[in-house]
């Protein structure tokens, strides 16, 4: 009887051990899957940032040109320098991958320092978007009314700020891709 009890005890210990090993393996597998998911989320955010950089680079020259044209018209007090119309396009940076990564189960597995740097860059991008929206509103408010220096001065001022922010956002995104810390807080 004692040997039977001892055998049952050994079997019970083995079963408990097997269950514990199974739990540990399952936990390890789940942890690995979450880390892999975090790596994919980070790669998606970095691809999104690279696409945003391309948009900012593609639209910088046109924005600078319009800003220079408006500046010349304002400095010379001559709205006729503007010609018939002012046309340019602004980037439409995406934050979809960034937002999705923040709401996913991968979020706790992303490097915290990287998350802070990316968050700061997207905050600057959001500020840029607000300034761009106001500049577009300002410009659209004078369409068909005949441009005057008085109406163009605030638009020019906003475009100066917008152009500066354009470069800041691009530079922050580029620094993220290069793995560099931001140059300013």
Question: Model segments located where?
Answer:
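N-terminal positive-inside, membrane-proximal cytosolic segments immediately preceding the first
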Residues: 1-16, 28-30
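Transmembrane signal-anchor/signal-peptide helices with a preference for the extracytoplasmic
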Residues: 19-41
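N-terminal alpha-helical signal peptides/signal-anchor transmembrane segments
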Residues: 42-67
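Conserved non-transmembrane functional hotspots
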Residues: 58-61, 68-82, 87
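Soluble extracytoplasmic domains of inner/organellar membrane proteins
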Residues: 82-185
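N-terminal soluble domains immediately following signal/targeting peptides that reside
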Residues: 59-66, 70, 125, 139-142
């Amino acid at each position: 009887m004692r040997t039977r009890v001892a055998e049952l005890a050994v079997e019970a210990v083995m079963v408990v051990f097997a269950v514990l090993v199974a739990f540990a393996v399952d936990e390890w597998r789940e942890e690995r899957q979450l880390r892999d998911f975090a790596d994919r989320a980070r790669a998606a955010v970095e691809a999104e940032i690279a696409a945003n950089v391309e948009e900012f680079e593609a639209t910088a020259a046109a924005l600078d040109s319009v800003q220079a044209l408006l500046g010349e018209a304002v400095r010379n007090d001559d709205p006729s320098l503007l010609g018939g119309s002012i046309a340019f396009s602004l980037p439409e940076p995406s934050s979809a991958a960034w937002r999705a990564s923040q709401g996913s189960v991968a979020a706790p597995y992303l490097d915290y320092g990287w998350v802070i740097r990316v968050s700061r860059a997207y905050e600057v991008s959001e500020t840029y978007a607000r300034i761009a929206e106001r500049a577009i509103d300002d410009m659209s408010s004078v369409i068909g009314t005949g441009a005057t220096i008085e109406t163009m001065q605030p638009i020019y001022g906003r475009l100066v700020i917008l152009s500066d922010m354009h470069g800041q956002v691009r530079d922050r995104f580029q620094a993220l891709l290069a793995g560099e810390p931001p140059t300013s807080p």
